[in-house]
C-alpha cells in the first residue's frame, strides 16, 4: 500500500488526462489502469461553460484529482494556479509544474523550490515535478513536499529512464514517496522504475497516444504491479563475473 500525505493508494500507477481523443476513452482507460490518482491541468477546466468537461467523468470514476500548474512560467503563476485549483476543486493537492521553456518543457528548479515552500506554508499537499536532482529533491522534502516527482526523460518523449543513475540516488535518500514522472513510454520502463524502488510512476502520453489506450492501460497496470513485486521479492545482485549455478566438476570425480 502506498501512502502519500496520509492517504493510502492501492495502485502505484498514476495517470494523466491529456491527449485522449475523447473524455469517454479517457475514462475507460483510467478505469482499466486501476489508477486512483489522476492529474488534470487547470488550463482545461472551465466550470462556467463546461467546455472540455473533464470533471464529470473523473468524478464518476471515483479517483482523487491532482490538479497541476502546467503552463506556469514562474513561482508567482504557479501559486496563482494552485490557489485557483483549491477554490474551484476543493482540494489541497497540487502537482507543481513550472517550465518556462516551451520547447523542452524542462522544470525550473529555482522557481519550483520557491513556489513549493510558499505552497507548503499555505497548507497545500505539494508534489513537484523536477529534474532528477538528488540535492533539489532533498531541499523540496525539507520545505514540506509530500512527494517528489523526478523526470525519467523529457515530457512526452517516451525515452524511458534516461536519468536512471540520479533516480537511484533520489530513491536511496528519499524520506517521502518518489514518483517517476515524464518520459515513461513503455510498460517495461514503468516496470524497471518500480524494480529500482520507486514508489509510483505517472504515465500519460504512452497510454493516451497508443492505438489502443485501454489495452495499453492494462499493460501499464500489470507492469507496475510486477515491477513492485519484483522489488519487494529482492532482485539478484548485478555482477560482471560469471557465477556458476551448479558444481562444475563434482560429478566427474564420482
Swiss-Prot record:
Disulfide bonds: none annotated. 1-deoxy-D-xylulose 5-phosphate binds at residues 156, 182-183, 204-205. The keyword ATP-binding does not apply. Pathway: Cofactor biosynthesis; thiamine diphosphate biosynthesis. InterPro entries: Aldolase_TIM, Thiazole_synthase_ThiG, ThiG. Its main location: cytoplasm. One of its GO terms (biological process) is thiamine biosynthetic process. One of its GO terms (molecular function) is thiazole synthase activity. It catalyses: [ThiS sulfur-carrier protein]-C-terminal-Gly-aminoethanethioate + 2-iminoacetate + 1-deoxy-D-xylulose 5-phosphate = [ThiS sulfur-carrier protein]-C-terminal Gly-Gly + 2-[(2R,5Z)-2-carboxy-4-methylthiazol-5(2H)-ylidene]ethyl phosphate + 2 H2O + H(+). Keywords: Cytoplasm, Schiff base, Thiamine biosynthesis, Transferase. The active site is at 95 (schiff-base intermediate with dxp). Its EC number is 2.8.1.10. It is an enzyme of class 2 (transferase). Gene3D superfamilies: Aldolase class I. Pfam families: ThiG. It is found in: Cytoplasm. GO terms for cellular component: 2-iminoacetate synthase complex; cytoplasm. The keyword Ribosomal protein does not apply. PANTHER family: THIAZOLE SYNTHASE (PTHR34266:SF2). Homotetramer. Forms heterodimers with either ThiH or ThiS. Catalyzes the rearrangement of 1-deoxy-D-xylulose 5-phosphate (DXP) to produce the thiazole phosphate moiety of thiamine. Sulfur is provided by the thiocarboxylate moiety of the carrier protein ThiS. In vitro, sulfur can be provided by H(2)S. Belongs to the ThiG family. This is Thiazole synthase. It comes from Shewanella oneidensis (strain ATCC 700550 / JCM 31522 / CIP 106686 / LMG 19005 / NCIMB 14063 / MR-1).
Amino acid at each position: 500500500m502506498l501512502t502519500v500525505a496520509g492517504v493510502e493508494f492501492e495502485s502505484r500507477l498514476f495517470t494523466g488526462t491529456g491527449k485522449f481523443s475523447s473524455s469517454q476513452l479517457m475514462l475507460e482507460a483510467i478505469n482499466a489502469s486501476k489508477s486512483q490518482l489522476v492529474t488534470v491541468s487547470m488550463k482545461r477546466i472551465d466550470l462556467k461553460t463546461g467546455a472540455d468537461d473533464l470533471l464529470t467523468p473523473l468524478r464518476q470514476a471515483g479517483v482523487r484529482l491532482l490538479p497541476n500548474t502546467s503552463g506556469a512560467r514562474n513561482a508567482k503563476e504557479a501559486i496563482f494556479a494552485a490557489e485557483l485549483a483549491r477554490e474551484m476543486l476543493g482540494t489541497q493537492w497540487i502537482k507543481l509544474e513550472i517550465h518556462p521553456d516551451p520547447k523542452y518543457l524542462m522544470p525550473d528548479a529555482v522557481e519550483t523550490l520557491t513556489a513549493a515552500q510558499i505552497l507548503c506554508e499555505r497548507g497545500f499537499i505539494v508534489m513537484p515535478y523536477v529534474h532528477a536532482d538528488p540535492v533539489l529533491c532533498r531541499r523540496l522534502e525539507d520545505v514540506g513536499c509530500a512527494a517528489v516527482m523526478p523526470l525519467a526523460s523529457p515530457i512526452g518523449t517516451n525515452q524511458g529512464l534516461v536519468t536512471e543513475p540520479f533516480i537511484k540516488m533520489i530513491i536511496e535518500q528519499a524520506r517521502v514517496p518518489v514518483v517517476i514522472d515524464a518520459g515513461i513510454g513503455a510498460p517495461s520502463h514503468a516496470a524497471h522504475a518500480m524494480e529500482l524502488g520507486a514508489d509510483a510512476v505517472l504515465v500519460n502520453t504512452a497510454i493516451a497516444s497508443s492505438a489502443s489506450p485501454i489495452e495499453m492501460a492494462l499493460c501499464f497496470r500489470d507492469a507496475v504491479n510486477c515491477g513492485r513485486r519484483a522489488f519487494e521479492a529482492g532482485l539478484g545482485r548485478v555482477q560482471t563475473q560469471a557465477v556458476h549455478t551448479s558444481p562444475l566438476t563434482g560429478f566427474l570425480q564420482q
